[in-house]
């Protein structure tokens, strides 16, 4: 590599006059810059604008020869053998003057001993190699991404299996603990039941032994007069029942026995209610059972009986019964109040009901008269009210009616007889009310009544002696 001489550099620096015929001006058609040297123009096109096609055209054979550069040995031998008539004449400027005029451009100068430029085929090969390398890199990245995803999926599945196994183990542990707890509870319950059963058996044995001792002592201490009174009463009722010549008396006896049983049942199916001060001014209903009524909800009707209206509210409007009351009146004065207790069976018909509403509907339809009539507090009542309160949505519906008792001429009868047609019959035989008014008979005394008067005992002893000695 030959460095430009100092004389050439000094001439450029001192701006030595040059022959105008040797000056050339080159204009850049990209940026408009004007250059006086062809080599500088070519370097400007290559460095600044990178115009390869223009540089290839500008670097002609003559220029290469002028600069002392050759394409190849074959090219130089071909140029020696062939002369070109259209070749550009050689520049009068010496070869030294065409060297670079600056130290910065010195290292960019192309010399003869350097390697030639790469050809187009090398560029294409380099492009293909770059594309192949990029494709290889892309495939490598894709393979790495695929491996990473597979590894992540494998780890995720392994974690899920671990979690499922932990959950199953926890469930098994809880089930085992629950089973052990239930087994222990059953053992404790069985032991407690056995202890309770043993204690109950011991208590029953003690009660039975005490009862046997007390019963034996009571039997020994019973008075002779009470035994004779019981025998006399039982024999008297047996004689009345066995007397076939008096069917009216027999029927009345049966009726009185039924009434006593009904009174006992009626006393068990109701409970007493306090008469609060505001109820003292209560008056009986004006309407009876058979007065037609309209529904207060749908305004439909008329309903000719209280039972039909009650069933209409229950079945059509799904109203629930809240309470059922009996009110006894002596004239217009309130003398008693009873609440019908909710039950799951009827004590008269021995019928069981799945719901309370069925029990109340059955009582209203079949037994309300005898249930009210048999109340002991209503013995002096002349009429009574039956009042039902039903809950419909957010309000309470009050239904009720009044019925009157028949005034019986004989006050010694146990119960008053209703008017014909008011009380539905609950037996197969229908009794004549007139026969019940004529005959008068005392009720059998209960076994619980132990206190007897001295006069009655004396009379019973005389009757027993007379029965033993009829003559």
Curated annotation (Swiss-Prot):
Zinc finger (C2H2-type) in chain: 26-54, 293-317, 344-367
Keyword RNA-binding: no
Localization of this protein: Nucleus
Region (Disordered): 80-107, 132-176, 210-244, 418-471
Biased composition (Basic and acidic residues): 140-176, 234-244, 439-456
Source species, domain of life: Eukaryota
Keywords, sorted A to Z: DNA-binding, Metal-binding, Nucleus, Repeat, Zinc, Zinc-finger
Gene Ontology, cellular component aspect: nucleus
A GO MF term: DNA binding
InterPro entries attached to this UniProt entry: Znf_C2H2_type (IPR013087)
Protein name: Putative zinc finger protein F44E2.7
Native species: Caenorhabditis elegans
UniProt lineage: Eukaryota, Metazoa, Ecdysozoa, Nematoda, Chromadorea
